[in-house]
A protein has these predicted regions:
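Acidic, metal-coordinating catalytic segment for phosphate/diphosphate chemistry
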Residues: 1-34
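Conserved beta-strand and immediately adjacent loop positions that scaffold enzyme active sites
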Residues: 19, 41, 127
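Extracellular/periplasmic catalytic domains that process cell-envelope and extracellular macromolecules
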Residues: 36-37, 99
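Short, acidic/hydrophobic/Gly-rich beta-strand patch recurrent on exposed beta strands
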Residues: 43-46
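A short gly/proline-enriched turn/hairpin at secondary-structure junctions
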Residues: 54-56
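Unchanged
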Residues: 58-147, 151
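Short, charged, intrinsically disordered terminal tails
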Residues: 154-160
Length: 160
């Protein structure tokens, strides 16, 4: 007699998503040996559907690679076409539908002159803000996003 109880629901793989920690330098604040300190600003997005502040991210289109998903989602949500940098880490949490979700993040930087490019609100994101890391941590809605950014501030990006 088997002691394994069958479940009514099939096993679901975690929901995959990818995004970016987009940074831009602040003029005149650079110091050798520091990575993510007040000399940089980080972009956060406000999503009206959830009334939350988060890092730009989203789900893949079909079999899209995570790196490509991250770049596309950052551009869709912020209007910034960025260069992909080092992997930063991942967050794991339960989404609003009770599913496990894993989001992989990469460091990204917009091209020179992106500061002057105007953001155009859309149905997913109605506001973006550039903030120094400490202020960004304070504004982020979710603990997993705050922990990721705080860890990055302490250690810098992961080495491949």
């Amino acid at each position: 007699v088997s002691k394994i109880k069958p479940t009514d629901e099939p096993h679901q793989a975690a929901v995959r998503a990818a995004g970016g920690i987009v940074r831009r330098p602040l003029a005149g604040r650079s110091r050798i040996g520091q990575w993510l300190r007040p000399r940089y600003e980080i972009v956060l997005v406000h999503r009206p559907r959830y009334d939350d502040w988060s890092l730009p991210k989203g789900k893949p289109d079909g079999d899209e690679r995570d790196e490509d998903t991250a770049l596309r989602e950052v551009e869709e949500e912020t209007g910034l076409r960025c260069a992909l940098g080092a992997p930063v880490g991942e967050t794991r949490y339960e989404d609003s539908r009770g599913r496990d979700k894993v989001v992989r993040y990469w460091l990204m930087e917009p091209p020179e002159g992106a500061r002057a490019a105007p953001f155009v609100p859309n149905r997913e994101v109605d506001e973006v803000r550039w903030l120094q890391p400490d202020a960004a941590v304070t504004l982020l809605t979710y603990p997993h996003d705050r922990e990721l950014l705080q860890g990055l501030s302490r250690r810098g990006p992961r080495r491949p």
